[in-house]
Amino acid sequence: MDIDLHDYIATTPDFPEKGVMFRDINPLIGNGPAYRQAINELIDFARPLKPDIIAGPEARGFVVGSPMAYALGIGFVPARKYGKLPRKSVSSSYSLEYGKNELQMHVDSIKPGQRVFIVDDLLATGGTITATMDLVRQLGGQVVGTGFFIELADLQGRKKIMEVENVPFKSLLEY
């Protein structure tokens, strides 16, 4: 039986700042059947794209990408916030819906030519994902697709992704 994943997204107005409608995935990832369904839907989308590795930005991209990588029998590469990696890394800056940030990956985390599927919990403006795409490209990887639990359609993140690179795209829920 399919679960309506909308039932497992909590909405908090004016968080983290006024005017932002925060979509909280904690109820979804806290419910085994709903979490399993969401991960399986993204796996079903990613599998035909034949990724060699899954990548996801800190922190909630880890929650989406790690179980996908495990189920597909491939690795997971974290895109970490600035200053969290101890070895040589590449960096990419981006703007968030409510601020600015920088992501990094170790230089040996993706090998040239690897097929990379990028995931996150939520797509807003597209800054986090396009920064992750930039990191993958800096390391010689090929982005084969992107997937999200939630897409905030009004913020046009999908458009931003497609302007950077026209890749297969999947969001499970749209607000």
UniProtKB/Swiss-Prot annotation:
GO biological process: adenine salvage; AMP salvage; purine ribonucleoside salvage
Pathway membership, UniProt: Purine metabolism; AMP biosynthesis via salvage pathway; AMP from adenine: step 1/1
Lineage of the species this protein comes from: Bacteria, Bacillati, Bacillota, Bacilli, Lactobacillales
Catalyzed reactions per annotation: AMP + diphosphate = 5-phospho-alpha-D-ribose 1-diphosphate + adenine
Compartment(s) of residence: Cytoplasm
Keyword annotations: Cytoplasm, Glycosyltransferase, Purine salvage, Transferase
Gene Ontology cellular component terms for the protein in this record: cytoplasm
Presence of the UniProt keyword Thylakoid in the record: no
Domain of life: Bacteria
PANTHER family tied to this protein: ADENINE PHOSPHORIBOSYLTRANSFERASE (PTHR32315:SF3)
Quaternary structure annotation from Swiss-Prot or TrEMBL: Homodimer.
Family to which this protein belongs: Belongs to the purine/pyrimidine phosphoribosyltransferase family.
E.C. numbers: 2.4.2.7
Name of the protein in question: Adenine phosphoribosyltransferase
InterPro entries, alphabetized: Ade_phspho_trans, PRibTrfase_dom, PRTase-like, UPRTase/APRTase
Matching Gene3D superfamilies: 3.40.50.2020
Organism: Oenococcus oeni (strain ATCC BAA-331 / PSU-1)
General function of this protein: Catalyzes a salvage reaction resulting in the formation of AMP, that is energically less costly than de novo synthesis.
